[in-house]
């Protein structure tokens, strides 16, 4: 009787293991109940003890089956969890690679833009240089034109002095006229040369300033681009 009650308690405790083990647990519980009833109705108790022992073995077998089922379910859950973790790791790795590729494209685009602007600044400087050279050519041309005018005036004076009936006073007056015209021509050339020189210096100054500003802007953009790339790499590593 005491043994049958212990079997009943073991069977009832095993009923809380897992949903998958419910059929075996119910069978063990029912067997224990019948064992109690049979033991209480038996006079000698020995047949009841034998039957209770057999039911105890059946209950133990059912408990083992239930434990095996629980272990199987636990392993399946563990395998699924491990698979989920691997999928999550793969997703994070793929995302990091995508971010890295995107950051590389952004950096390359920024680098191309900086190179294009640098080339543009270089072209501007070349244009300013050509313009300054053009100013110098204009100065030379103006000086040559003035010199030609002076030569023409001198030749005219020579002709007048050597002409028949030419007088000393006329020659003197002509010479004064030539000198005045030569001085006027020289002053005009000097004035034009000064203006052109100022313009050339202004052009060179503007081009140099523009080139310096472009270099500063390009350097700042390069630093900004490198900082952005560094931040993206840091986030991808995290």
UniProtKB/Swiss-Prot annotation:
Record bears the keyword ATP-binding: no
Region called Disordered, residue ranges: 41-62, 182-238
Entry's Gene Ontology cellular component terms: mitochondrion
LEA 11-mer repeat repeats: 64-74, 89-99, 140-150, 151-161, 179-189, 190-200
Annotated function: Mitochondrial heat soluble protein acting as a molecular shield in water-deficient condition.
Disulfide bridge map: none
Name by which UniProt lists this protein: Group 3 late-embryogenesis abundant protein, mitochondrial
Biased composition (Low complexity): 226-238
Comment, domains: Contiguous repeats of the 11-mer LEA motif is characteristic of group 3 LEA proteins and form an amphipathic helical structure under water-deficient conditions.
Keyword Mitochondrion listed: yes
Organism: Hypsibius exemplaris (Freshwater tardigrade)
Highest taxon of source: Eukaryota
GO biological processes: response to desiccation
Gene3D superfamilies, per database record: 6.10.140.1430, Apolipoprotein (1.20.120.20)
Compositionally biased intervals (Basic and acidic residues): 182-200, 213-225
Coiled-coil ranges (or none): 50-202
Membrane-spanning parts: none
UniProt family annotation: Belongs to the LEA type 4 family.
Compartmental location: Mitochondrion
UniProt keywords, alphabetically: Coiled coil, Mitochondrion, Repeat, Stress response
């Amino acid at each position: 009787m005491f043994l049958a009650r212990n079997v009943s308690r073991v069977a009832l405790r095993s009923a809380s293991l897992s949903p998958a083990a419910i059929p075996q647990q119910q069978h063990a519980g029912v067997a224990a109940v019948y064992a109690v009833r049979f033991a209480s109705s038996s006079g000698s108790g020995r047949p009841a003890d034998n039957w209770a022992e057999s039911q105890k073995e059946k209950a133990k077998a059912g408990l083992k089956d239930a434990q095996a089922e629980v272990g199987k379910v636990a392993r399946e859950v563990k395998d699924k969890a491990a698979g989920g973790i691997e999928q999550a790791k793969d997703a994070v790795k793929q995302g990091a690679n995508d971010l890295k590729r995107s950051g590389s494209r952004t950096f390359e685009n920024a680098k191309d833009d900086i190179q294009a602007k640098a080339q543009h600044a270089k072209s501007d400087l070349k244009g300013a240089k050509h313009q300054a050279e053009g100013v110098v050519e204009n100065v030379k041309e103006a000086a040559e034109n003035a010199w030609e005018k002076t030569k023409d005036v001198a030749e005219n004076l020579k002709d007048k002095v050597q002409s028949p009936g030419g007088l000393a006073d006329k020659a003197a007056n002509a010479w004064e006229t030539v000198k005045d015209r030569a001085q006027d021509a020289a002053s005009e050339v000097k004035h034009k040369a000064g203006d052109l020189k100022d313009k050339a210096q202004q052009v060179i100054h503007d081009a140099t300033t523009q080139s310096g500003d472009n270099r500063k802007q390009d350097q700042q953009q390069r630093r900004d681009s490198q900082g952005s790339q560094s931040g993206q790499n840091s986030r991808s590593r995290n």
